Swiss-Prot record:
This is Myrosinase. The keyword Ion transport does not apply. Coiled coil: none annotated. InterPro entries: Glyco_hydro_1, Glyco_hydro_1_AS, Glyco_hydro_1_N_CS, Glycoside_hydrolase_SF. It comes from the Eukaryota. Belongs to the glycosyl hydrolase 1 family. One of its GO terms (molecular function) is metal ion binding. The keyword Transport does not apply.
């Protein structure tokens, strides 16, 4: 009789579990409050799925104990470009000395992965290995990695997250010159030799699209190059916005592929994996009934994703880019094409927003032309009916507001699986910012970030289940509040609150507590978002939902 009762109980629990799994519904339309996904948890993704947080060296470490990098040079030369508050990464979370605090926060979250970057100029202050290696930098990263492994947190290390040693920029304009390939290889070789016994997931370059476009086309990011008339305030120190982005992108791909080849040959015995990180977006037709808008959306996909993914899968640039860009687009030699094609074990995909695409004439040649115009596409966050995609993502009175669309992550993952051969994928960034003008209580009561994370995780689970996309991990951006590129300290992205007046004062925000429960698998029967929202808006901000 006891056996029958036991079997019945097991059956009921299994049935309840299946029912709960089936009841998870992703909200398809604005406002994406995630009220129907309160039972979503890590258990819906499989036991080996990695849930972590992410950061980058320049944004959290501070300037102590390293050489000067291009973001130091850029932010001091053009402080207004580094952030409207005129601040920079000289002093931020000071993770170089407070790394244990970061690890403690990750332990509190029960994170199983941490994506962070090495500061090239901390390890090799003058850029080239031949000019000396900083033992203090090596020791710092060893201590951090050892502390992570002690807590069973898997390190994902990015070799280059935009902070190129300034010496290499001064000598030959960094990625604009092929000399960078050997210097990047030497730097990577040192890192593999020094840390490869502990680190099994390597990322070569973060967001291949960003430095060529923002750094060399429009000059809004380091190193800040562009054509004279692209920045009418003449704050670019030189450049050609029509040609340099394609050269930089080409050299990035060759540097990436060279490092992957090094890892696969010289360090194969370490049994790790290596790949690049892509910034992704989804592009919807501005007018779904207009063939020109539909064509513009796909053309944007080719210029945004295909620019890198076609070489990485086929060894050549997309046909549409070759047709439009012409001689401004470099060519791969046969040997280079073979080197680049297939040069990844996994892809890291960063996803934040979706945009509407409509045709726009390409003004080339002109004094104000940039490579970003070659697609002949205008991007907006509202469609032909004046409808916005979703809730506010970033308020920007100068450049215009942006809005987010959780289902976009579903479309992006399916697109990469279908078009690029079903790669192994890690979502290496996904996150939401709030304004730093909020007071402490408001910043900690970040229910909007819970909505953002929860709704995106819901669609990520959905695309894995429905389309069989091979996603093995998700990293929320960011571990804690930090310096944001081009925004300074005017926004907060963290799951943990950082008090800039007392850097040891850090607390999990409500989003951090939610993510903690999500990872633990204890969000079933959690309080509804509406109740959470009203509670967090009240004066009882300090109330903990430990039973949620």
């Amino acid at each position: 009789m006891k056996l029958l009762h036991g079997l019945a109980l097991v059956f009921l629990l299994a049935a309840a579990s299946c029912k709960a799994d089936e009841e998870i519904t992703c909200e398809e339309n604005n406002p994406f409050t995630c009220s129907n996904t309160d039972i979503l948890s890590s258990k819906n993704f499989g036991k080996d799925f990695i849930f972590g947080v992410a950061s980058s060296a320049y944004q959290i470490e501070g300037g102590r104990g390293r050489g000067v990098n291009v973001w130091d040079g850029f932010s001091h030369r053009y402080p207004e470009k580094a952030g409207s508050d005129l601040k920079n990464g000289d002093t931020t979370c000071e993770s170089y000395t407070r790394w244990q605090k970061d690890v403690d926060v990750m332990g509190e979250l029960n994170a199983t992965g941490y994506r962070f970057s090495f500061a090239w100029s901390r390890i090799i202050p003058k850029g080239k290995v031949s000019r000396g290696v900083n033992q203090g930098g090596l020791d710092y990263y060893h201590k951090l990695i050892d502390a992570l492994l002690e807590k069973n947190i898997t390190p994902f290390v990015t070799l280059f997250h935009w902070d190129l040693p300034q010496t290499l920029q001064d000598e030959y304009e960094g990625f604009l010159d092929r000399q960078i390939i050997q210097d990047f290889k030497d730097y990577a070789d040192l890192c593999f030799k020094e840390f490869g016994g502990k680190v099994k997931h390597w990322i070569t370059i973060n967001q291949l699209y960003t430095v060529p476009t923002r750094g060399y086309a429009i000059g809004t990011d380091a190193p800040g190059r562009c054509s004279p008339m692209v920045d009418t305030k003449h704050r670019c120190y030189g450049g050609n916005s029509s040609t340099e982005p394609y050269i930089v992108a080409h050299n990035q791909l060759l540097a990436h592929a060279t490092v992957v080849d090094l890892y696969r040959t010289k360090y194969k015995f370490q049994k790790g994996k290596i790949g690049p990180v892509m910034i992704t977006r989804w592009f919807l037709p501005f007018d779904e009934s207009d063939p020109a808008s539909i064509e513009a959306a796909e053309r944007m996909n080719q210029f945004f994703h295909g620019w890198y993914m076609e070489p990485l899968t086929k060894g050549r640039y997309p046909d549409i880019m070759r047709q439009i860009v012409g001689s401004r687009l470099p060519n791969f030699t046969e040997e280079e094409a073979e080197l680049v094609a297939g040069s990844y074990d996994f892809l890291g995909l960063n996803y934040y927003v979706t945009q509407y695409a409509q045709p726009k004439p390409n003004p080339y040649p002109s004094e104000t032309h940039t490579a970003m115009m070659d697609a002949g596409v205008k991007l907006t966050y509202d469609n032909s009916r004046g409808e916005f995609l979703g809730p506010l993502f970033v308020e920007d009175k100068v450049n215009g507001n942006s809005y987010y669309y959780p289902k976009g992550i579903y479309y992006v993952m399916d697109y990469f699986k279908t078009k690029y051969g079903d790669p192994l994928i890690y979502v290496t960034e996904n996150g939401f910012s709030t304004p730093s003008s909020e007071n402490r209580e408001q910043a900690i009561a970040d229910y909007k970030r819970i909505d953002y994370l929860c709704s995106h995780l819901c669609f990520l689970r959905k695309v894995i289940k429905e389309k069989g996309v091979n996603v093995r991990g998700y990293f929320a951006w960011a571990l804690g509040d930090n310096y944001e590129f081009c925004k300074g300290f005017t926004v907060r992205f963290g799951l943990s609150y950082v008090n800039w007046e007392d850097l040891d004062d850090r607390n999990l925000k409500e989003s951090g507590k939610w993510y903690q429960r999500f990872i633990n698998g204890t969000v079933k029967n959690a309080v509804k978002q509406d109740f959470l929202r009203s509670s967090l808006s009240s004066q009882s901000q300090k109330k903990r939902f430990a039973d949620a």
